[in-house]
């Protein structure tokens, strides 16, 4: 079994899989609602510019918002210290699976903070699913213990 995501759809873009969706990935400890105003502004600007409608999504990460909490097994297993060393990779797979299940091959991925970690992992594991990345207030290295 894989990690399940709760996808929040701001606009479905007419379900036109010839367009490229924008997937907004929230940070920790918030959920998709952090993107509400941004998604509305993005949609409104696209309409004003005459851009063909495209999907705008903001899936909740597991355990955030309406995101179901996966089992330890679905998360890739837990180390003796309680860490989930494969958790981020499994989440990246789940986001790409969601994209493909909707009939899209690529997305524009936007990640804030921990969402940036996730979309960098998507780029590493699934570069074919990336049309573009927007990294917001994030970094490529993991947080330190400090």
What are the roles of these predicted feature ranges?
Residues 27-30, 113:
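Active-site glycine-rich loops that stabilize anionic/oxyanionic intermediates
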Residues 30-31, 64-67, 141:
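Active-site loop signature of alpha/beta-hydrolase-fold enzymes
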Residues 17-18, 48-54, 128-129:
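Short helix-terminating capping/connector loops at secondary-structure junctions
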Residues 30-33, 37, 117:
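Short alpha-helical
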Residues 105-144:
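Conserved hydrolase catalytic core segment
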Residues 25, 59-61, 136:
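Alpha/beta-hydrolase
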Residues 19-27:
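Short beta-strand element of the alpha/beta-hydrolase
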Residues 2-12, 37-110:
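Active-site loop/oxyanion-hole signature of alpha/beta-hydrolase fold enzymes
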């Amino acid at each position: 079994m894989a990690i399940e995501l709760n996808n929040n759809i701001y606009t479905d873009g007419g379900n036109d899989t010839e367009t490229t969706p924008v997937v907004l990935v929230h940070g920790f400890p918030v959920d998709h609602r952090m993107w509400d105003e941004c998604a509305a502004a993005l949609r409104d600007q696209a309409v004003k510019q005459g851009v063909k409608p495209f999907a705008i999504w903001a899936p909740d990460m597991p355990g955030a918002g309406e995101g179901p909490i996966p089992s330890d097994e679905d998360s890739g297993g837990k180390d003796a210290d309680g860490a989930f060393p494969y958790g981020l990779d499994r989440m990246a797979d789940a986001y790409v699976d969601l994209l493909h299940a909707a009939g899209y091959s690529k997305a524009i991925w936007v990640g804030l903070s921990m969402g940036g970690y996730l979309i960098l992992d998507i780029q590493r594991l699934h570069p074919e699913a990336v049309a573009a990345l927007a990294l917001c207030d994030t970094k490529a290295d993991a947080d330190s213990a400090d």
